[in-house]
From Swiss-Prot:
Similarity remark: Belongs to the TRAFAC class translation factor GTPase superfamily. Classic translation factor GTPase family. LepA subfamily.
Subcellular localization: Cell inner membrane
GO molecular function: GTP binding; GTPase activity; guanosine tetraphosphate binding; ribosome binding; translation elongation factor activity
S-S pairs: none
Protein origin, superkingdom: Bacteria
Gene source species: Vibrio parahaemolyticus serotype O3:K6 (strain RIMD 2210633)
E.C. numbers: 3.6.5.n1
Keyword tRNA processing among UniProt keywords: no
GO cellular component: plasma membrane
Protein name in UniProt: Elongation factor 4
Positions annotated to bind GTP: D14, H15, G16, K17, S18, T19, N131, K132, I133, D134
Bilayer topology annotation: Peripheral membrane protein
């Protein structure tokens, strides 16, 4: 056991985590050169296309150190994006140490900081690594100082390496062996295994990634899932060397995968504890803190026949992604679907794209909203995650919106732009600290403003140098209203949005103008209106297409033309009463463009 090292790699987006993992695998001979590909661990197509890590991946490598001993390294490559911070905290729970990878050109960024603090809170040994020292812009001395000043860990003798060229990777491995402590645990105690992650395999059923804290797990053992109390037989178990390799036993301190033939998706939830069915442990391990979704959106299948498949797909996906929340929802405009909760906009895009690709579904998404706390006049408290659930105006005492605490790290040259942006987003400054050339600014900004496009705007005003980390702080009373959209006088529930009263006029106007672009012209006028309660605040009209009925009249009497026009007018009127307006998917996404221009 003293030869096992469990660690995660944490870093900001694009600081070279996945490339470093590739090098570690190569040096330790986890894969032959023929099988080696760039970013081996980013196994999803989506990850490769976007160049980001979405799911944490684990690998077990054997490394022969300079002291002649062979060590078993279990490491977990984690995502760097703020939306997937939950994946990171889960991975860290399975480790004793973390490599903090910092780009020697760019220095410390907000996400580095957030993940590093998570690691320190969990009492992990944090080992700083300066990556990309082969770049001409690299300045390891400055960055080492920055790490000491901003993060507060000793970094003067931080290992320097270039994951791309392979320079210094041996030193990184030696450092892991010497600096990261061996796992603690009692091999003779009853089995306790923490489920770090699970996914659904069509042939094997549920596959779980586990970290053995105490005891050991063997093939054909009878095990029990603590939360459900169900017992299963272990069919197969093993490790990843990135490839799935079968073994006969997983010992204390090891990380590996287990298949127990569980077919029910909720059979082995992430964060749960496995123990032996006979003489097992009676105490579960402390799991993970549950994350609350920050953004909610309705997802509806385009054809209602897909509803069952959609439900199964969501079930399988939520097994793999513990932070996804969903419940059935019914909309007058879109039929049956689900209200889903996500950690952020990127998370939402990724989930939608995975559902469409992996499960072959066609989906319509409604505009995302955050959760509001609503106090009714009779004192009842509601949590509203969809504009349709907001009570009538005269039943509401006050609406409180969620406020996010945003930590932004930005070079001092771009500070002005960032402050302007935060103020425009109704932010309040909490703190500002200068660290050399970097400034750490803290703002309290309404979650609704942060979630939509704050990240993109922040990147563009600071030319990509600013970085952001945010978390939910509190609910605060605010003057929020619901803007409804009416098409020919009928409310479309899926198009409503909740916004601040000061911005409701502009948002309403932008929304109807945007909708006008997306709704195709029909044989009758379509009036698009935005309303707060019964008060119409904006309107635009999609003009009808009309046939030129008087084309066949040559000269002749004007009353003849009038008669034809009148007849056409009556026909249009009749049509308007019975006609339906077809809404394309783009019209539902028009809300997303509101407030961007």
């Amino acid at each position: 056991m003293k030869h096992i090292r469990n660690f995660s790699i944490i870093a900001h987006i694009d600081h070279g985590k996945s490339t470093l993992s590739d090098r570690l695998i190569q040096v330790c001979g986890g894969l032959s050169d023929r099988e080696m590909a760039a970013q081996v661990l980013d196994s999803m197509d989506l990850e490769r296309e976007r160049g980001i890590t979405i799911k944490s991946q684990s690998v077990t490598l054997n490394y022969t150190a300079k002291d002649g001993e062979t060590y078993q390294l279990n490491f977990i490559d984690t995502p760097g994006h703020v939306d997937f911070a939950y994946e990171v905290s889960r991975s860290l729970a399975a480790c004793e140490g973390a490599l903090l990878v910092v780009d020697a050109g760019q220095g410390v960024e907000a996400q580095t900081l957030a993940n590093c603090y998570t690691a320190i809170e969990m009492d992990l040994e944090v080992v700083p690594i300066l990556n990309k020292i082969d770049l001409p812009a690299a300045d390891p001395e400055r960055v080492a100082e920055e790490i000491e000043e901003i993060v507060g860990i000793d970094a003067m003798d931080a290992t320097r390496c270039s994951a791309k060229t392979g320079l210094g990777v041996e030193d990184v491995l030696e450092n892991i062996v010497s600096a990261i402590p061996a796992p603690e645990g009692d091999p003779d105690a009853p089995l306790q295994a923490l489920i770090i992650d699970s996914w659904f395999d069509n042939y094997l059923g549920v596959v779980s990634l586990v970290r053995i804290k105490n005891g050991s797990l063997k093939k054909n053992d009878k095990i029990k899932v603590m939360s459900t109390g169900q017992a299963w037989g272990v069919d197969r178990l093993g490790i990843f060397t990135p490839k799935q390799v079968d073994t006969d036993v997983l010992n204390t301190g090891e990380v590996g995968w287990v298949v127990c033939g569980i077919k029910d998706i909720l059979g082995a939830p992430v964060g749960d504890t496995l123990t032996l069915a006979k003489n097992g442990s009676d105490k579960p391990l402390p799991g993970f803190k549950k994350v609350k979704p920050q953004v909610y959106a309705g997802l509806f299948p385009v054809s209602s026949d897909d509803y069952e498949n959609f439900r199964d797909a969501l079930g399988k996906l939520s097994l793999n992604d513990a932070s996804l929340f969903y419940e059935p929802e019914n909309s007058a405009a879109l039929g049956f679907g689900f209200r889903c909760g996500f950690l952020g906009m990127l998370h939402m895009e990724i989930i939608q794209e995975r559902l469409e690709r992996e499960y072959d579904l066609d989906l319509i998404t409604t505009a995302p909203t955050v959760v509001y706390e609503v106090e009714k006049t009779d004192g009842e408290l509601l949590y509203v995650d969809s504009p349709a659930k907001l009570p009538a105006i005269n039943d509401i005492e006050e609406i409180r919106e969620p406020i996010a605490r945003c930590n932004i790290l930005v070079p001092s040259d771009y500070l002005g732009n960032v402050i302007t942006l935060c103020v425009e987003k109704r932010g309040l400054q909490v703190d500002m600290v200068y660290h050399g050339n970097q400034v750490a600014v803290t703002y309290d900004i309404p979650m609704a403003e942060v979630v939509l496009d704050f990240f993109d705007r922040l990147k563009s005003t600071s030319r990509g140098y600013a970085s952001l980390d945010y978390n939910f702080q509190r609910f605060e009373a605010s003057n929020m209203v619901r803007v409804d959209v009416l098409l020919n006088g009928d409310k479309v529930d899926a198009l409503a949005l909740i916004t601040h009263k000061d911005q409701s006029q502009t948002r309403g106007r932008q929304l109807v103008e945007k909708m006008k672009e997306f709704i195709p012209r029909q044989m009758f006028d379509i009036a698009i209106q935005a309303a707060i309660g019964n008060h119409i605040i904006a309107r635009s009209t999609v003009k009808q297409l009309r046939k030129n009925v008087i084309a066949k009249c040559y000269g002749g009497d004007v009353s003849r033309k009038k008669k034809l026009l009148k007849k056409q007018k009556e026909g249009k009127k009749r049509m308007k009463q019975i006609g339906n307006v077809e809404l394309p998917q783009e019209a539902f996404l028009a809300i997303l463009h509101v407030g961007k221009d």
